[in-house]
């Protein structure tokens, strides 16, 4: 399969149609302004913004903290199980349209339990959407519970205990929210407990934080996958380790530009990550806030980086399946589908 023969003008359609997985999506970050307004009206809540347009205009944040401030405000409209279902269902419809065959979805229960929303309300709504997505859309999805790193480890232990009766409804835990001043080791004990429970482990590291945070996520949390991780290139020894151990990075290009991790997509290091042999993937992070779902991230990144071609598209999609937490047989089936798709593109030439 000689992918170098696929012309550059064929890339946009190829990127949109190829089967792929999404491994870094915060479900609360998929809340579009229209749905925020609809849920506020349904729950008789008064928003700080008089119109959908004024809310969308407020999305002009310039760093991670200013984004998080409006992100948590938007999440406040989620009150009932139906609200959580509607949010997840809207995302799954968008994912299906982008030819996502599998999604591993982050949710932030502490954002809601702190407002008095029962954990059961949150996870039952999300899980119902996932089951319906499997049955009606043919899309595979799983939940990853994220601890908020700006809160205490004691808070993380509390939400873990609340989650355990629903252990069959989520596959792992992650660590998100503001990196600065909240190093991975702050959560080493709760991650050790999650490891004992057989949960899969991921962590945000090396987005705002330094390469050292990635080392700590790997060594002190035993993270199997690093979310973001783009600062790894600052440390050649870390790059060697990531390549040797094939630790996946779930990279989010549009998010990185919106939050000023890179000045623009032309400066993004995703092509260099791939060239080093790192198992990098492309993801949307918080698509309602960062200007694009998964295909938009692929399209804009490939348009900005001429060194990315069909071979890199194949590698990114394959990486997304290989980095997922499904069993080997299912992964192999998806990779066969991917191979068939790319072979068909080659046969057209």
Curated annotation (Swiss-Prot):
Enzyme Commission identifier(s): 3.5.4.2
GO cellular component: cytosol
Cofactor binding: number and manner: Binds 1 zinc ion per subunit.
Chain residues that bind Zn(2+): 24, 26, 204, 285
GO terms for biological process, alphabetical: adenine catabolic process; hypoxanthine salvage; nucleotide metabolic process
Record keywords, A-Z: Hydrolase, Metal-binding, Nucleotide metabolism, Zinc
SUPFAM superfamilies, sorted: Metallo-dependent hydrolases
Protein purpose: Catalyzes the hydrolytic deamination of adenine to hypoxanthine. Plays an important role in the purine salvage pathway and in nitrogen catabolism.
Protein name, as recorded: Adenine deaminase
Species of origin: Trichlorobacter lovleyi (strain ATCC BAA-1151 / DSM 17278 / SZ)
